[in-house]
Amino acid sequence: MGCISSKNVSCLTDQGDSPLPEPGLLSTSQQHRVLIDHSLEASHNSKRSRKSRRLGGSDLRIGVSLGSSHRNIEAEQAAAGWPAWLCSAAAEAVHGWVPLKAEAFQKLEKIGQGTYSSVFRAREVETGKMVALKKVKFDNLQPESIRFMAREILILRKLNHPNIMKLEGIVTSRASSSIYLVFEYMEHDLAGLSSNPDIRFTEPQIKCYMKQLLWGLEHCHMRGVIHRDIKASNILVNNKGVLKLGDFGLANVVTPSNKNQLTSRVVTLWYRAPELLMGSTSYGVSVDLWSVGCVFAEILMGKPILKGRTEIEQLHKIYKLCGSPQDSFWKRTKLPHATSFKPQHTYEATLRERCKDLSATGVYLLETLLSMEPDKRGTASSALNSEYFLTRPYACDPSSLPKYPPNKEMDAKYRDDMRRKRANLKLRDSGVGRKHKRPHRAEYDPKNYAKLPIRKDTLEVKNIPNEASRATTTTHGNYYKVSDLPMTTGPASGFAWAVKRRKDPDNISTLTYYQPSSKSQLSGTSVAFAKNTFGLNLKPDNDSVWEVQGNNYDDVIEEVPSHESKLSRIGERHGSLDGSGLDFSQREEDSPKKTLEHLQFGKQSISGPLIFKSGKIDEILQRNESNIRQAVRKSHLQREQDDR
């Protein structure tokens, strides 16, 4: 009895903070039992405290031993050949494995390209077996990037299913900064097969592919793995008809701790679920089911069914295909900005119209997978148990599937490029849609002056002494003769000029100016050209009125450097053909008398097409050209007199 009562008292004191009974209210025997019980409880508490101190010390020793064991594991992995940056950041990813040597494989051509990886076909040197080497892109100096890469390795090691790509090894070395993942080589992917115009799948073949895809996805979801990048190019097929799900670079393991902390920036845009497009960060396996529905429709139609260029356009295409959600959907959704994605117009679903050749059970399965509400898409297991796979014709055996030449996404892109090139060649031969070719940019580049051939119609100025005929065109500090200049020059020199033969009797030479990014062309001998290029105060004829239109300041002509535009290089020779210092509109009698020191070189403030309202442009051009010829002739005569 005493033991029972003592246990009861002890139990009460443990359960709550109830006060002790007062000794006056109890008998002597009861008071004695209470005191004994409390003395026993105190002794038990002291024993527990001593035991906890001993356990605390043992916990500390265990922590120290764990830390030392972790360092020992890193040392063992480094001795096995793993790089130090991988052992320190993600040792668990390669625990128990030994790295493969790069010399054991002969890398061949590239067969795939992704955002975070590149895939190559390779041959194992010892056995001659074909494998696929996936080079993962990451920064080995950033631990987070290393752990992101290692997550794919951990997930692949966790999964083991005939319809999932199996990781066979890792190629790296102690001094390497890269990693290659070794997989079985698969000859095809669904993107290449479905887009091939020579391949048309039958319904039993489609069911065979879809069942294998759902089997592999069911294995992932049962282990808490969401793929998050299911698309046709990531679904691989070998010549035996076996389908395998690959590329787990964006996959993640969903746990209660991270269920509401996922990112919405996953899945390729054409296969992305609407809740991800709306910015959801709390989702489950239903995002993979939506992608499976997109792949299902792509196999049926031979092309992606939802090809949006932006997220908003992708949502709009989803509304047009699956119909706009009901009002109840917007009320139940927990997304903060979901109402901003609500369409202004109600869309009716057009999926049945686009899948007329599909059976009723197939359309129902496709509508289920492409449901706007994630809860209505079901699971991979429910899709496998749908009537589509339980009705005739049944899925065929994978070994009975036909064998095709290698077809991958890169092959499909190559076929599309060749098809476009052939179409362009046909249009070019027929003359339809032919466009005039614009002059090559190299003609305007001042660096290519010496490399370009001289135009045949360039008029050389002869019988003029070398010093008088030298054009002081300043381009990056180089000087060129008149006969060495091409017909067009770039904007860096501040002007462009060329003398051309004209078929008209007057043989008027014109100067052509090309603005950096303007399609308009303006004669270099016009008054407006000289004024806007060199800042001269020139007055055109009263009948010739011109305007400057446009405010494009991106086409401003570069200012001629002062150290390169000194008039000492020209001297007092007014016959020099330096376009940066010659007043083309000066009168014939004033030309040999005036100096060029009063000219101010500045930057063009307004760039744009110049429109002349008068029709007397030819007279201005002829007079200016006459002034140039007279200046050259008088300079020649003046030089001859000086030589005498």
UniProtKB/Swiss-Prot annotation:
Compositionally biased spans, kind Basic and acidic residues: 565-576
Tissue expression per record: Expressed specifically in flowers and pollen.
Class of this enzyme: transferase
Residue segments, region Disordered: 565-591
Main location: nucleus
Recorded GO CC terms: nucleus
EC number assigned by the record: 2.7.11.-
Protein kinase domain mapped to chain residues: 105-389
Sequence motif: Nuclear localization signal, positions: 420-427
Effect of deleting the gene: Light green to yellow seeds.
Keywords: ATP-binding, Kinase, Nucleotide-binding, Nucleus, Phosphoprotein, Serine/threonine-protein kinase, Transferase
SMART domains on file: S_TKc
GO MF annotation list: ATP binding; protein serine/threonine kinase activity
Comment, domains: The protein kinase domain is predicted to be catalytically inactive.
Record's protein name: Cyclin-dependent kinase C-2 C
Gene: CDC2C
